[in-house]
Amino acid sequence: MRCILGTKKSMTQIFREDGTVVPVTRVQAGPCVVTQVKTAKRDGVSAVQVGFGPQKAFRLTKPLKGHLKDLDAVRHMRDFRAPENHGLSRGDSFTVSIFSAGDRVQVAGVSKGKGFQGVVKRHGFSGGPASHGHKDQLRMPGSIGSADPARVFKGMRMGGHMGDQQVTVKNLEILAIDEEKNELLVKGAVPGARGGLLMISTEDGKIDVSTGADETKAEVVIEDQSEDVSIPEEKTASEEEAVTA
C-alpha cells in the first residue's frame, strides 16, 4: 500500500517519444507525515492517518493541538486503509519518491459543485418536444409516476444539487515524477477544481521511510551544532584589582 495527499494544480499536455500527445494533470503531492496509526484491535480498522499542508498553530482547535502535540501543524488529515504489516509509525514522513513512473493509482477528490440543476443537465434527460403544440416543456422531466400507487417512488431522478461529491477515478497512470518540486504528472483528468485536495493511492508496494528519516535526523544534528552559545569568562582577582585601580 502506497498513499499520498496532494492538491490539483492544472492540466497540460506532454509529448511521448513517438510524437503522440498525452493530456496530463499536474498534482502537487507531499511531503506528508503520519499523524496516527490505527489498528484493528484498538480502533476497529487497520489504517494510517496522513497529514499534508502547512498550517498556522493558532488556527488549530484544542483537540487538534493535543492530537498533533509532538508534530508540526498540518492543514489536511485523511485515513488510508493499510495492512497490519505496513511498517509505518507516527511521525514518519515521505514524499512523491514512493511512486515511480508507470505506476497505476486511484485518485479521489471532491467534484466541482454545479448548484441546483434540472434533469437535463443532472441526469441527461432529453426533455420534451419543442413544437407541435407544446409550450414550456422543452426541459421538463415528464411523468414521475402513475396514478395507481398515487405516490412518487424513492430514488426517482429529479432536479437537485449537482456535484460537490467525492469521486474516485481508478487505474490512472503516473507518467512522470518531479521530486524537486514534489509534483506528479497523472495521465488524464482527476476530479475537483484547482487547489482541491486529492487522495492518491495504490495497493501495490510499500512505503519506505528509512531514507527520509535519516535525512531528517541529520538536519536536526546540523542545526544543533550551528548554535553558538558564548559563555563569559570569569575574571581573576589580579584583573579585578587592575580594573578598580
Please name every model-derived segment:
Residues M1-A245:
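Extended basic (Lys/Arg/His-rich) segments that typically form rRNA-contacting surfaces
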